[in-house]
């Protein structure tokens, strides 16, 4: 009997669970190892060199778990580490791409707000993407230090208070399109829509998972409601706190 393909997913904490949820929508027979580096979260306010060391350490752990590929399910980790680690590891390393391209192409000439961590906002990867799209004048970059940490703590009331003035300001500027440049923020979609009802939200999860499955030659068939998922996953949260495992379970079952 053929062994299922084993894939590693990593994030600084809970954000990558939004990517895992996307992966579990497909009728694929995968074995997934998810590593949340909560002992060292959040990554978004650290130096890029420190993030690189942390991500390298997690990838070494996942390689010892005999995964065939690793997805950095974290925009900050991708910005700071993906390019370097692809040269160091013999297995494929995939990363996240903020959904700036579809947001710009689907809304020609219109402003697009990008919510992301300080590391993602200042790294060369993002500047290069904006330049390629000739979108430097259209993308409003908004750094959100501390917001991912509120998701890791499950403090959605504080997250809403944090976002309210940002969203009010965007509405005053007639911004209609919002890119979530951090996988943690995907869990804040309902809060965003409650405070900014007509905004169009873009995130990179769907495109990333399609690219991952295509690259690994895994059939892309969406599960229907009556099918059971054949993939299995293991959660490793290095905080080892019961609270985080409960929160992970809640986030994975959250309705979109």
From Swiss-Prot:
**Molecular-function GO term, any one:** amino-acid racemase activity
EC number annotated for this UniProt entry: 5.1.1.3
**SUPFAM superfamilies in the record, alphabetically?**
Aspartate/glutamate racemase
Query: Which InterPro entries does the UniProt entry name for this protein?
Result: Asp/Glu/hydantoin_racemase, Asp/Glu_race, Glu_race
Sorted alphabetically, the keyword list is: Cell shape, Cell wall biogenesis/degradation, Isomerase, Peptidoglycan synthesis
The UniProt record lists the keyword Transmembrane helix: no
Q: Which residues form the active site?
A: 74, 182
Catalysed reaction equations from the record: L-glutamate = D-glutamate
Q: Which GO terms describe its biological process?
A: cell wall organization; peptidoglycan biosynthetic process; regulation of cell shape
The pathway it acts in is:
Cell wall biogenesis; peptidoglycan biosynthesis
Which NCBIfam families is this protein grouped with? glut_race
Per the entry, what this protein does is: Provides the (R)-glutamate required for cell wall biosynthesis.
- Family, similarity comment: Belongs to the aspartate/glutamate racemases family.
Recorded protein name is Glutamate racemase
Name the gene.
murI
